[in-house]
Amino acid sequence: MKLAMAQMSMSGSMDENLKKSLAFCDAAAGSDLLFFPEVQLTPFFPQYAGRNVDAYAVPAGSPTVQAFADKAKECGLYLSPNMYLEQEGKRYDASLWLTPEGVCAGVAKMVHIMQAAQFYERDYYTPSEDGFLVFDAPWGCVGIVICFDRHLPESIRTCALKGADLVIIPTANTKAEPMELFEWEIRVQAMQNQIFVAMCNRVGREDGMDFAGESLIVHPSGDVIYKADDREQLIVQELDLAEARLWREHKRPYLKQRRPECYL
């Protein structure tokens, strides 16, 4: 399959960010799956505590969501935009799963909500009630793990146990964070779970945050397939997701050795 990631910067205008996102979809036509960084339609507002961000909430079923669904159908690809989604009176850090038929087949929501300096996410996000979700496609099974959730190893492990061949991670990592350590974190989890992992980051400076880019694709062996720099770009990479199953079943069958009865 052909995976595409839109490593992009965001302005203060949701309309501009939507137009840019849809332009990335056009550029990715011919790919099988395109996904984006965390909260791609807005500035990274969680860097501020307790602000009124009503204007940034995207209602489920809104024209914005429909625009992405229509574009998925037009381009004939699976599409996973991440946004500040409002659904049934609650707001989430959420990634949609849109099919090439233009149907929203599911919504993955952040499970663990961080609260720390410049990441005041509990001020804005409701934790997922659904846990970690995986989605089937003709070329494989995809799990979605949103940003901070990847720091809890149960996230990618759960996706692997549910049969995912690939985990995609929309994120917002800054240059002030330990990016080299974050790379190794992804590599180790890919190796431990015999799974492809792709992480798509923001770029650009937004007030006190300088987003690092360095989007990453890692093989089930733990080897880096692709690593970006800090510039805005569309990343397209061919992946054979059958390799995840080969590694999990034969080359490194770690998951078969698990003894859950011994774990807390």
Predicted regions and their residues:
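Active-site-proximal beta-strand elements of phosphoester/diester hydrolases
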Residues: 1-12, 94, 140-149, 168
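A conserved C-terminal secondary-structure "cap"
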Residues: 244-264
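Short beta-strand scaffold segments in enzyme catalytic cores
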Residues: 81-83, 94-97, 133, 215-217, ...
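Cys-nucleophile CN-hydrolase/nitrilase-fold catalytic domain and related Cys-dependent amidase chemistry
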Residues: 14, 22-100, 173-188, 192-195
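CN hydrolase (nitrilase-like) catalytic-core segments centered on the catalytic cysteine
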Residues: 57-78, 151-234
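Active-site catalytic loop in hydrolytic enzyme cores
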Residues: 86-162, 175-184, 249-253
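Residue-level recognition of beta-strand->loop/alpha-helix junctions
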Residues: 7-9, 37, 109, 201
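Short, acidic/polar
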Residues: 16-25, 152-157
